[in-house]
Structures are given as C-alpha cells and as structure tokens.
Amino acid sequence: MLIAHSIADLRSALASRGRPAFVPTMGNLHEGHLSLVRQARTLGDVTVASIFVNRLQFLPHEDFDSYPRTWEADRAQLEVAGCDILFAPREADLYPQAQTFKVQPDPLLADLLEGHFRPGFFTGVCTVVMKLFSAVFGTTGGGTALFGKKDYQQLMVIRRMVEQFALPVDIVAGDTCRAPDGLALSSRNGYLGPAERTKAVELARALRTLSDAALSRPVADWPGLEAAASDALRGQGWQPDYLVVRRRADLQRPDTAPRPGTLVALGAARLGSTRLIDNFEF
C-alpha cells in the first residue's frame, strides 16, 4: 500500500492507474469503514482511502482535540483490506491557507436534524469532501466514492452536492455494520464505558419501535409517536436530540400515508458524554 501525504504525491500515485474508488474517513477505523474499502475494490481500478480529522466540521465545544488518532492500527487494517493508496494529508497539506471559500449546502436538507443541533457541520463536511474529491478525482476524469448509511443525512447531503455541481463521481452507499447486539458501529463507541456500552443498543431499539409504530398509525400521529420515543429513551437515562420518521428522498415528513420502503427513522442522543446517531430504513 502506497501512502501519500500531499495532493501532488497522491495525483502522481494515481497517474495512469484508471478510475479510483475512494473511501474517505477520519481514521479510528472499524468494520464499517473496512467493508467499504473491500466493496471499493470491486468498483474501481485503484482503491483509495483517506484519513483526515477535519477541523471544519467540529463545533468549538466538540471533540476535535480528543478524537482518537489510531494511525498504526488504521494503516495496518487498510493494508489487509486491500487498499492500494492511503491519502493521509496533514492539515497544512489540505488547508495551506485559511479556508475562506466554503461549500454551503442546501438549508432545506442540511439545516434540519444534525444540521440543527450541529450548526455549520455540513458546511465543514461538504468543504472537505469537495477538496478530497478534487485531490482524488481531479486528474482521473472521475470515479466512485463510498459512504456509509450510518451517517444517513451526510450521505444525502453529499449526493445532493455531487448532483448540484455535476461532479463526475458516482456515490455508492454502504449498509450500516452492527455489533451482535445491534449497536451501529461508530468510531465514537470507544468513548463508552462498560455499562454505557451495554445500554447503547437502546437507541437502535427505540428507532425500531418507532418505525413499527409509524407504519401502523396515520402521519398525523407521528409527532406524538416521536415525542413518546424520545421520552422513553430519556427515561432510560439518555439525552435525546431527536427521534423522527422522515421520507428517505428529502428527510421531510410526508403529507400523506407513504408506501413502506420509502421511509427512514433517524435518531441522535447522548449517553453520558457520548453522542450517538443511528437510523433504520423501512
């Protein structure tokens, strides 16, 4: 596996290698990331992963400084998974100057749910993804990028960005990987203490219960179902930000009874000091 730190070195490594399949990450890798890398190997001529903890998508009070950096383990896992090129830029490589130009996503999609509770988050995400796409695909004529469904709203925002800017990038979604008890794998699960880890699956169960209830009740009842789901989770010791049911297409609440297979239940809640997100399509 070749490791490139600068954009120039990355582009040199990609020269004459064909179409890349690219998996962007912030490191601290788990099976969800590695499954995307393995899938990428079937979708391009050369498999590229990146590790970069992007300061722009963290709010001032969030965990940028404490976010786990596990370079040696990540590098070894990527090599075993079959990654051809690891792009690991330093901050000065990706942001050599203050990033005064930013990508502002559509507020109808990016200012609700995660965007409401983490203002500016998706601006930071879109800006770094645009820079990464430029680095990886800028001299290759396009390719494929893979993102996990666990970060559902992020996936949708990036898809919309690619459409709006007519980028020559195919976005492929990977299914959420889960622990045997049903907890969605996440780099932030490592923050959980033993007792919290046992309880953490309660978020997934709450979303399953909410999705089942939504299918059996009219749309007019959904706000009450969502409030009850949040109250139940709060009673189990969580601090919920939201538990909602939305259309997959645009993350809005339907006006009329939707067809099964077009909806997603999404949730975000804090257990102790750890904020977890999850979702279920149904």
Swiss-Prot record:
Keywords: ATP-binding, Cytoplasm, Ligase, Nucleotide-binding, Pantothenate biosynthesis. It comes from the Bacteria. Catalyzes the condensation of pantoate with beta-alanine in an ATP-dependent reaction via a pantoyl-adenylate intermediate. It catalyses: (R)-pantoate + beta-alanine + ATP = (R)-pantothenate + AMP + diphosphate + H(+). NCBIfam families: cyt_tran_rel, panC. Belongs to the pantothenate synthetase family. The active site is at 33 (proton donor). One of its GO terms (biological process) is pantothenate biosynthetic process. This is Pantothenate synthetase. Beta-alanine binds at residue 57. Its EC number is 6.3.2.1. It is an enzyme of class 6 (ligase). It is found in: Cytoplasm. ATP binds at residues 26-33, 148-151, 185-188.
